[in-house]
Amino acid sequence: MSDIKQLISIIIPVFNESESIGFLLDEVINVMSFHKFNFELIVVNDGSKDNTQQVLKQLTLKIKELSVISLRKNYGQTAAMSAGFDNSKGDIVITLDGDLQNDPNDIPILISEINNGYDLICGWRFDRKDKLINRKIPSKIANKLIANVTGLKLHDYGCSLKAFKKEIIDDIKLYGELHRFLPVLANIEGARIKEIKVNHRSRQYGTSTVSYTHLTLPTTFGV
């Protein structure tokens, strides 16, 4: 059972996701309403070049929990996530992608783990639906590199589906590409961290905007 006094902030950075964002918000609202969570939705439009902004404007007229932050240009996921964090009011903050590959049905599990005493819950896409060469292999290499260098052993640093206690978010300042290192930064702050398996779905609309050129060693670690 949910704590009705507890506010959950759900942050969704988007870039050119006009086809998927409406379906995603419907799914999130259905899950949160079924579990009787008190929640807010924050969608950060990271300089989309399609009609994402127009779609979001229409959605705000129908969804009372929804607020939209619009960035003037495409600043990247770290800046978009940081803008969402800065405007969130929840006791627990959830992040997920806007492309429907993260499954909103996993959100209640993450919230439950936070309420069990953890500060950060990280999703692990143990059965990824990406193409092997394009996504899985570079991701696996990056995860091993980050784990070996930082000492924090996670299977999936790149999964956007995460849950944070608000006070952990307040202690972390993001810049550059540091959203990839949120678990490491939280660990430095003494956070209790747990990784759990989550569902991963195939992309139904559009194409991925993720480039894996950042997975070279110098750019991955900011040197």
Feature locations, PLM:
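Conserved alpha/beta core of the MobA/IspD/sugar-nucleotide pyrophosphorylase nucleotidyltransferase superfamily
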Residues: 194-198
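Structured catalytic core of nucleotide-sugar glycosyltransferases
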Residues: 1-132
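Short loop/turn motifs enriched for small/polar and acidic residues
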Residues: 44, 199-201
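Broad structural signal for hydrophobic residues in well-ordered alpha-helices, predominantly aliphatic
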Residues: 59, 145-146, 223
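Acceptor/aglycone-binding surface of glycosyltransferases and processive sugar-polymer synthases
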Residues: 69-73, 77-87, 101-185, 201-215
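Single conserved hydrophobic/aromatic residue that forms the stacking wall/gate
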Residues: 214-223
